[in-house]
Amino acid sequence: MCSNFQPIKTEHAQWVEEQFGCSLPEATWRAETYPTYPAPFISLQDGKPNCDLAQFGLVPHWADDKKKFGLRTYNARSETVHEKPSYRHAWKERQFGLAIMESFYEPCWETGKAVRWRIKRADTQPIAVPSIWERFIDKETGEVIFSFSMLTVNADGHSIMQHFHKPDDEKRSIIVLNEADYLPWLHANHEQARSLLKVAPDNFLVSELAPR
């Protein structure tokens, strides 16, 4: 499960335009993203890709504490996303998006304590992660709440992702799509979406120590 990533940098604005035909938001965001932080996110607007800041950690409209809810909804298991109360509306409505980033971080416990590692694409290109999103106007504050959760899959046996998290925990991974699958994901029906939710090929990613 991924709770920390390095969002896309403005230096890759041209990559966003080439891949999605839209621009990065005219805003600032933190160098690292944690749950409830805003980060650049791709979703369809009037049928076309659009990039805006969205909160990492999905907030459904019925959430009581909308400020803290995202602390526990930043990842959604792909196997159960269609039935979990927090996620099923976004999945049913095919609110599919992409979290765009430079790299993401995971803890390796093989030394007996958590050591942070960075995972990125082997070709150093930005990463796009299949996600679901919600957007609504808070009736109490009038604020537009736009938020997302990254989908995860089992990663047991993956050459890189099997090394992260505690020894007895199931190995999970976010999904890193190939460029050819970006637009198909955004426009997918449920069957098509399911076919894209799989762990990245072993040679697609590399990892390195990234201590704080």
Model features per residue range: what roles?
Residues 1-212:
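Short linear sequence motif anchored by a di-proline
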